[in-house]
Amino acid sequence: MFNVTKKSIEWGGETLTLETGKVARQADGSVIATLGETSVMANVTFAKAAKPGQDFFPLTVHYQERYYAAGKVPGGFFKREARPSEKETLTSRLIDRPIRPLFVDGFKNEVLLIVTVLSHDLVNEPDIVAMIAASAALTISGVPFMGPIGAARVGFAGGEYVLNPDVDDMQKLRENPEQRLDLVIAGTKDAVMMVESEAYELSEAEMLGAVKFGHEAMQPVIDMIIDFAEEAAHEPFDFSPPDYAALYAKVKSLGEAQMRAAFAIREKQDRVNAIDAARAAIKAQLSEAELADENLGTAFKKLESSILRGDIINGGARIDGRDTKTVRPIISETSVLPRTHGSALFTRGETQALVVTTLGTGEDEQIIDALHGNSRSNFLLHYNFPPYSVGEVGRFGPPGRREIGHGKLAWRALQAVLPAATDFPYTIRVVSEITESNGSSSMASVCGGSLSMMDAGVPLKAPVAGVAMGLILEDDGKWAVLTDILGDEDHLGDMDFKVAGTENGITSLQMDIKVAGITPEIMEQALAQAKDGRMHILGEMSKALSSANSFSAYAPKIETLTIPTDKIREVIGSGGKVIREIVETSGAKVDINDDGVIKIASNDQAAIKKAYDMIWSIVAEPEEGQIYTGKVVKLVDFGAFVNFFGKRDGLVHVSQIANKRLTHPNEVLKEGQEVKVKLLGFDERGKVRLGMKMVDQETGQEIQPEKKEREEAGEA
């Protein structure tokens, strides 16, 4: 009944297994990949014909994590998986980016790839396993896919690269100074296709070494998929790339001159309008059959690409007049919004980001519910890309995959320089509003985010800047690396290479390559140019702000104290009674962590002090020999009970009330009276013994022995 194909190798200290033929047999390609005890199933289906008139490649990738994979039940009212989490969205993009360029040019049939996590051992990250499963499923499906690809995660600890570090090592990257890198790489046998990383100020050489290490480490996986496909692959889909040479030749002859003139216009919107006019002029001269040809859009793109790329390769001139190494003009401004905690307006050419920082308390932290367990994040970065930023009418609604991905890239770039939570106990939310875009808006978010946080008073370890690099690589081997690319250069070029970091090193690297043939020499040149660009941008940013401003007057003040964990219950009280009383009485917000760290927040310093004192009175232990102010709560024949330390009471024996003989404490005391007492010690049952007669009730100072003797002699 089942025709099962199964292959296994030892890889990175774990067993990697690929299996097909038993599950999801009606899909065009189905593979279950297992690394350790983490199993991921990838299923590929594709339409056998393209939709009429379709001029793009409709590839859809869905990565989904099932809670049962880790033995968990989903939270929420409905108790089932709902919309994709941020991690699922990011992993979907992680799978999509390296495989999309590997489909045969001209293939426009719809392809659906669904990747599902079936089992998670909480050691091996499922994203790498998912990429391998997806690659294998595509390779055996028969779809015209020029793979396979392999994938690997690379860490860097103690000066050594580490293949596929454990989940725990990566989850607490920010808290572990030994672990300085989380890099995911994907590629074919001969070429790197995609890199995604967060780093802690690594040098260009260290980052390039990580890329090389990862590419070498994935080679056994690629060989395994090839062997696997030789036994399990379906018949290749009968597809021949369309021949549109005649159509392209006609489009070129009719409109190359006008299109070239349009690309010579430096202002983006004027250039866009001129390109649209050139297209319209060409279309006006085409026949109905040529206008209906589904390859017309491809022919236009090829013409535009040849003009832009040829000018750069042959003359070194870009469409906005810059050479290949120049960064566009930069204007940085801070404190642009009066009532926000921190704000910055970062403008680089025709790309602009308005970035705002808000400081919150512990209750504002994001709770992340993941397969490996719940966690909290005190740093949030949200990226918004409205249609008006590119002068268009378009979809407006919740953030899409691109916005989530760009926001995460900026998050990775900035989180490496954040202060430790113990030094700066705030939740930090950064929002980047892209108000203009002509390339590299995510890197503008990094620059604006750094300025905005410093404007809010966040003590960053160092300012961070980012730059997007591009590449033109021709078939004859000529190439050029471009610094600070425009939108058209991104669209028509061969590489999108984003680098962010400080003066000391790289904090984030993202690379997407559309062609094979990217050599180490090209990558070295790109990293070197990116460093020069980053240093220039940091210099321009420093003109606006070079270090953290004074703390925003509108941000909440936070003080922390650490208490013994066995005292947490006392601070919270039965049913939360005590903590509610503290909050209501003081007016401050109080957040208690399981490790005994308490954060007290308020805009009013007096409220913070009140809450602090109330908590301290509960958890602190009174010291023998110290003098305290208390209140008489009860009088009995043998003495007075005094509340002197938070909710703690002690007994002042009748003999310790005054320097004279008393028959009853009510001769000198009454309930509710404020008194000064000295802690004499504890009896054999642990009860507190207090004294009054040795304390001056007016000053609260201890009466010196000589004075006490004189008082006693006078009374005698």
From Swiss-Prot:
Cofactor(s) the record lists: Mg(2+)
Ranges for domain KH: 556-615
Region of interest (Disordered), ranges: 695-716
Pfam family, one: RNase_PH
Top EC group: transferase
Annotated localization: Cytoplasm
PROSITE patterns: KH_TYPE_1 (PS50084), S1 (PS50126)
S1 motif domain ranges (all copies): 625-693
Catalytic activity: RNA(n+1) + phosphate = RNA(n) + a ribonucleoside 5'-diphosphate
InterPro entries assigned: ExoRNase_PH_dom1 (IPR001247), ExoRNase_PH_dom2 (IPR015847), ExoRNase_PH_dom2_sf (IPR036345), KH_dom (IPR004087), KH_dom_type_1 (IPR004088), KH_dom_type_1_sf (IPR036612), NA-bd_OB-fold (IPR012340), PNPase (IPR012162)
Keyword Nucleotidyltransferase applies: yes
EC number of the protein: 2.7.7.8
GO cellular component terms attached to this protein's record: cytosol
TM regions (residue ranges): none
Keyword flag Nucleotidyltransferase: yes
GO MF annotations in UniProt: 3'-5'-RNA exonuclease activity; magnesium ion binding; polyribonucleotide nucleotidyltransferase activity; RNA binding
Positions contributing to Mg(2+) binding: D490, D496
Keywords on record: Cytoplasm, Magnesium, Metal-binding, Nucleotidyltransferase, RNA-binding, Transferase
Bias (Basic and acidic residues): 704-716
Gene Ontology BP terms: mRNA catabolic process; RNA processing
NCBIfam families: polynuc_phos, PRK11824.1
Physiological role: Involved in mRNA degradation. Catalyzes the phosphorolysis of single-stranded polyribonucleotides processively in the 3'- to 5'-direction.
Family, per entry: Belongs to the polyribonucleotide nucleotidyltransferase family.
Protein name: Polyribonucleotide nucleotidyltransferase
Naturally occurring in which organism (per UniProt): Cereibacter sphaeroides (strain KD131 / KCTC 12085)
